[in-house]
């Protein structure tokens, strides 16, 4: 594969992870995630030993969503984990993990920083996604953009400062809170995201030496 192809594949993974943190899975999205093309994508991603267990768990849940009730239960898991903002949830905002204040504000420093990154790239958070710019879905989508449009050094700098600096804390919180739910979909998704980011960081570092 050429560097262009590799970076395009990296961008696809970041965009996929971003989309799964951005909103609940509805029936239309489920069809996309379980299509023949998607199954091939999951299988290819799962060949890597560091991703295989998480990918298998994700595929098992997706392929088992055969009723409206099952979809609603997964949507309730998403809401309970990422939308309600209690001690039993895992809020997906960088500011809540990077700021030392006891009650950090949303739309604070990390939001402003991400907004500036987006502005510099002539991008913006879509109007139908009314969230602060330091939401994990926005950050992962932007990393996918950088994969195709920026040099390795800029990608690595952003990854270190805006993702790797807090992702492990977020993932630990997801795993802790999601253990109360039956299928563990979001635990697997979070674990896969962390493993992907760590592997991508390592490959960027190697490419620069």
Swiss-Prot record:
Record key words, sorted: Chaperone, Cytoplasm
Keyword Cytoplasm: yes
GO biological process annotation, one example: protein folding
Cellular localization per UniProt: Cytoplasm
Family annotation (Gene3D superfamilies): 1.20.120.1820, HscB, C-terminal domain
One cellular-component annotation, GO: cytoplasm
Tagged with keyword Chaperone: yes
Family of this protein: Belongs to the TorD/DmsD family. TorD subfamily.
Known function: Involved in the biogenesis of TorA. Acts on TorA before the insertion of the molybdenum cofactor and, as a result, probably favors a conformation of the apoenzyme that is competent for acquiring the cofactor.
PANTHER family for this protein: CHAPERONE PROTEIN TORD, CHAPERONE PROTEIN YCDY
Name the record gives this protein: Chaperone protein TorD
């Amino acid at each position: 594969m050429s560097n262009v192809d590799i970076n395009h594949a990296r961008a696809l993974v970041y965009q996929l992870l971003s989309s799964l943190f951005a909103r609940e899975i509805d029936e239309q999205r489920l069809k996309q995630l379980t299509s023949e093309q998607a199954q091939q994508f999951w299988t290819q991603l799962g060949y890597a030993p560091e991703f295989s267990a998480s990918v298998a768990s994700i595929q098992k849940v997706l392929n088992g969503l055969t009723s409206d009730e099952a979809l609603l239960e997964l949507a309730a898991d998403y809401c309970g984990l990422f939308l309600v903002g209690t001690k039993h949830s895992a809020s997906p905002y960088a500011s809540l993990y990077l700021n030392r204040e006891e009650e950090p504000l949303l739309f604070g420093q990390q939001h402003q920083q991400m907004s500036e990154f987006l502005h510099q790239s002539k991008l913006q958070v879509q109007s139908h996604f009314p969230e602060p710019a330091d939401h994990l879905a926005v950050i992962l989508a932007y990393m996918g953009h950088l994969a195709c449009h920026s040099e390795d050094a800029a990608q690595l700098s952003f990854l270190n400062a805006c993702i790797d600096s807090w992702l492990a804390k977020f993932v630990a919180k997801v795993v802790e809170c999601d253990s109360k739910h039956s299928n563990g979909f979001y635990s697997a998704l979070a674990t896969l995201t962390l493993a992907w980011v760590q592997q991508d960081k390592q490959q960027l570092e190697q490419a620069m030496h």
